[in-house]
């Protein structure tokens, strides 16, 4: 347990940030899962719309510092490649 006041505050701050990041990552995974399901079904129109919204969510996660920009670029590239194979 922290003995210093600033450490106690950092613990509280870090916990809030952890929960916020967890929620962002969860919504990202949900969006990616939905896109992959649309690709698996062969629904090109729906998958195209979902790719745009998923890419936007990935970019926002990078801006918030939740994921690294290279990870987002890698995921966007892989998802676009999968969509283009339809």
Swiss-Prot record:
The protein's matches in Pfam families, at most eight in alphabetical order, are given as: Ribosomal_S20p (PF01649)
Where, if anywhere, are coiled coils annotated? none
User: Region (Disordered): which ranges?
Assistant: 1-25
Instruction: List compositional bias (Basic and acidic residues) regions by residue number.
Output: 1-18
- Which InterPro entries does the annotation name? Ribosomal_bS20, Ribosomal_bS20_sf
Q: Which domain of life is it from?
A: Bacteria
Annotated Gene Ontology cellular components are: cytosol; small ribosomal subunit
Task: Write the record's keywords in alphabetical order, separated by commas.
Answer: Ribonucleoprotein, Ribosomal protein, RNA-binding, rRNA-binding
Q: Where are the transmembrane segments?
A: none
Q: Name one GO biological process term.
A: translation
Q: Which HAMAP family match?
A: Ribosomal_bS20
* UniProt record similarity statement: Belongs to the bacterial ribosomal protein bS20 family.
In Swiss-Prot or TrEMBL terms, this protein is called: Small ribosomal subunit protein bS20
Gene that specifies this protein: rpsT
């Amino acid at each position: 347990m922290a003995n210093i006041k600033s450490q106690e505050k950092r613990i509280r701050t870090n916990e809030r940030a952890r929960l916020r990041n967890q929620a962002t990552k969860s919504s990202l995974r949900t969006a990616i899962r939905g896109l992959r399901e649309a690709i698996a079904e062969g629904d090109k129109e729906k998958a195209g719309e979902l790719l745009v919204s998923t890419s936007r969510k990935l970019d926002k996660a990078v801006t918030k510092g939740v994921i690294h920009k290279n990870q987002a670029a890698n995921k966007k590239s892989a998802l676009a490649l999968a969509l283009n194979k339809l």
